[in-house]
Structure formats: structure tokens, C-alpha cells
Amino acid sequence: MKWLQIHITVDQEQVEFTETLLMSLGAVSVTLDDAEDQALLEPLPGETPLWNKVIVTGIYQQDEQDPIDVDTLEAFLKAQLPDVPMRHEELEDQVWERAWMDYYEPIQIGEKFWIVPEWLEPPEADATNIKLDPGLAFGTGNHASTFLCLQWLGKTDVKNKIVIDYGCGSGILGVAALLLGAKKVYATDIDPQAVLATKQNAELNGVLDRLYVGLPEEFDQEFKPQQADVLVANILAGPLMALAPEFAKLLKSDGDFALAGVIEEQVVDVSGVYSEFFDILDVEKREENWCRISGKRKTTN
């Protein structure tokens, strides 16, 4: 079977209409991608986070007995969406199945880590190689905030320590900590798919026996009343600020922490909230204004 992809570049205001239009014409799926390499920032309450320019891609099955007339389909779409860039391509089944896999290559992060898609061989066998299924959930090492957290973990002493990975996504940070010798990682995420992905990626790396992962309410029951030696949270500024008092309870006095998912303009606000409970020792910035805030839990009496 062949597949037909229609790519349409529209303004943010046209996205919903374009999605609905493609689905009404029989698309088996519709995906959204950034058309201008922009950072997707945290939305205000009630807003949908989208880029200014969006590539909307509809995917159609091409039945050999009754194929889609591409010219007719594009003519109809152009009548509904005049003056917008549009292109199409046809993919064979085997190309379609592997297209997303071909996008990924091993990524080196700092001096310690290689992030290696599970179907590829590590470039350096003696490095700390994190095997990953990039299709499972957010967090592959490509995003600046994930990179910053991994870089920090590589410089932080986690050996034989209890580590919390809050907002675990793919589980990449928790797996990294375990490969560096952490005694136990407690991971949590609000997304059930992330919980599953974290388990699967931990199993890929042979560290599942030292990992606990669950939804926040399950995590609360499992972890309390313990305290961790290290806490890393790669989420967004709003949730991070709301969670500051909770993180203060979860982390031991003088424990290490790192926060990411924060842009430069939000650093002052986030640091201000955390300064009540934590000593801010470092702010590291990477491309697209993404920052990492790190430091230590203040000593409590």
C-alpha cells in the first residue's frame, strides 16, 4: 500500500480549520509541525500552544484499485485555502514505516553521555550510552531543556543516591541517573504514556529494577515520607513555581536540584519563588533562550 502526504503551511489562526478540512477529506491522521524553527513557549491559561506558522500534514491511504486523484484533491484544498504553500509526496509502505526512525541519530551530550536510538549501535562502547525509543514520549536529548538536565546530571554526584525525576517524559533523565550509579530513581509524570515510556526505556537499559515510576498521586503514596538526595524537574515555569513547596519537602537539606523548561524571561520569577527554600547557585542558558536553574536545598534545623 502507498501513502499520500499533503503538507500545508498556514497561520496559527487557520490550523483548526485546516485540520478539520483534511480529516473530513479522509485523512487517517493529521500532524502539526513548526514551519519557522520557533520555540514553543508556555501558553497563558486557556490558550493553545502553537507556533505562528504551522505545517499541517494530512496522511491518506492510496488504494491501488481506487487511488486518490492528487490534482483534484489539491485543487479543492487550494479553493478552501487560497494563497497558502502546499505540496504533496507519495511514500511506499516500507518508507513510511521507517521515515520517523531515519530522523534520529546518536547524540553526544557533555563528556559522559551518548543518547542512542535502540536500533543503532553506540558510537563509543565505553561511554555512558542511554538506549532510547524516541517515539514513546517527550525527552530525547534533542530539546535544549533535556540537554541541559543531562549535562547537569553528568556533573552531579548521584552514585548510591536517591534521585527524583519529576515530569519524567521518556524517562531519559532517570535512566541517565541510574546508569551513573544512582541507588534508586523515583519518577513521575501526569501523562500515562510517559509512565509506560519510562518503564520501557528503563528496561531497554537494564535498570528497571532500580526504578519506580507512577502518576503523581501514586508517586506521593510510594515515596513519602522519604527524602531524596537529588531532584531534577524538566517541565514548565508555571508548574515549577507551584511545586516549589512540594519539592522543598521532597529534597533533603543540602540536596542538589535542577529545574528546566524555563525560558530566560522566566528565570527571575522562578528563582524568586525557589529562593525561599533553595540556594540558587547557577543559571545555565542554551539556544532559544532555554535555561536551567540549579542549586541546593537550604539547610533546615
From Swiss-Prot:
Catalytic reactions on record: L-lysyl-[protein] + 3 S-adenosyl-L-methionine = N(6),N(6),N(6)-trimethyl-L-lysyl-[protein] + 3 S-adenosyl-L-homocysteine + 3 H(+)
Subcellular location: Cytoplasm
SUPFAM superfamilies: S-adenosyl-L-methionine-dependent methyltransferases
GO cellular component, one term: cytosol
Xref: CDD domains: AdoMet_MTases (cd02440)
Gene Ontology BP term (one): methylation
Keywords of this entry: Cytoplasm, Methyltransferase, S-adenosyl-L-methionine, Transferase
Enzyme Commission number, as recorded: 2.1.1.-
Gene Ontology terms, MF aspect: protein-lysine N-methyltransferase activity
Coiled coil region boundaries: none
Binding annotation for S-adenosyl-L-methionine: T146, G167, D189, N234
PANTHER family xrefs: ELECTRON TRANSFER FLAVOPROTEIN BETA SUBUNIT LYSINE METHYLTRANSFERASE
Family stated for the protein in its record: Belongs to the methyltransferase superfamily. PrmA family.
UniProt function note: Methylates ribosomal protein L11.
UniProt-listed NCBIfam families: prmA
Cross-referenced HAMAP family: Methyltr_PrmA (MF_00735)
Name of the molecule in the record: Ribosomal protein L11 methyltransferase
Organism: Acinetobacter baumannii (strain SDF)
